[in-house]
């Protein structure tokens, strides 16, 4: 609808940052365009003189799909990474640190004449998950090399799985994940609670999973919730995911050396940087997290 398109365009309005003008609200706006599990946007922001702290909003946690909050803390890392690139457009260097005392991510901001906006900053408003079949175009070697590099951070590396055999192995894991999740009533209820079945609901909440990203038609919420009980099955979801994976250029797996909150934040930063680089290449991406969930 025009109303939905106007709302989406407003949220994703390209920034007008200027070097020498510090605009904390614009930094936060760009941070909120980051990835988050079920698009829950589980963050709060505290503005201070020379820093912005990104804090977890546990009222938006997903206890069934994310019982240890690892996705939530990865989401904080994604938001921090966006803020780093937005800060550069304002002539600010950004030093990101995890604060275990309050489980927050502190972004320290300093004037730096050497930093400038990059094409990753421009990609922030373009990046989004696209959960439909892709066109099958292969990535060329320079793109692959840059994507792998974009997904590397201290103690985090990216593995690119590109062959048909590797895709089939991933499909097997995803299929088993779908079976475990979609036969779990608590998982289904939690997932459905975050789906926005029509533009009006998406505009009203400003969060959640829009049916548009997976090519679903807009339906009244009461009707869609009744229909989804019939159509959201392990077999159907497995077929959709298999089609999407086979049509893709490949699957990226982000591997962290450690498994704690600080490491989850770093993994989120690595993923977001990767996704921004992909968006700068006009490459579409989506999560396929069932195997780790």
Residue ranges and their predicted role:
Residues 1-293:
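Acidic, surface-exposed loops and disordered segments
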């Amino acid at each position: 609808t025009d109303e939905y398109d106007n709302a989406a365009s407003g949220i994703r309005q390209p920034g007008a940052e200027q070097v020498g003008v510090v605009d904390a609200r614009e930094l936060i706006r760009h941070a909120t365009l980051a990835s988050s599990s079920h698009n829950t946007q589980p963050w709060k922001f505290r503005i201070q003189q020379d820093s912005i702290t990104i804090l977890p909003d546990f009222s938006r946690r997903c206890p069934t799909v994310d019982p240890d909050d690892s996705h939530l803390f990865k989401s904080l890392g994604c938001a921090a990474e966006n803020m780093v690139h937005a800060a550069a457009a304002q002539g600010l260097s950004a030093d990101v640190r995890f604060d275990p005392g309050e489980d927050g991510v502190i972004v320290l901001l300093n004037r730096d004449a050497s930093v400038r906006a990059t094409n990753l900053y421009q990609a922030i408003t373009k990046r989004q998950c696209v959960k439909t079949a892709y066109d099958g175009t292969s990535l060329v070697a320079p793109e692959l090399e840059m994507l792998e590099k974009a997904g590397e951070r201290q103690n985090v590396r990216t593995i690119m799985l590109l062959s048909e055999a590797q895709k089939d192995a991933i499909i097997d894991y995803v299929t088993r994940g779908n079976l475990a999740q979609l036969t779990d009533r608590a998982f289904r209820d939690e997932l459905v609670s975050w789906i926005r079945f029509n533009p009006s609901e998406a505009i009203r909440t400003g969060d959640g999973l829009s049916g548009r990203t997976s090519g679903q038609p807009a339906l009244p919420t009461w009707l869609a919730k009744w229909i989804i009980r019939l159509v959201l099955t392990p077999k159907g979801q497995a077929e959709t995911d298999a089609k999407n994976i086979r049509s893709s250029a490949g699957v990226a797996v982000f591997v962290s050396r450690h498994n704690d909150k600080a490491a989850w934040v770093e993994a989120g930063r690595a993923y977001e940087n990767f996704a921004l680089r992909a968006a700068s290449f006009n490459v579409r991406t989506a999560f396929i997290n069932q195997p780790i969930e």
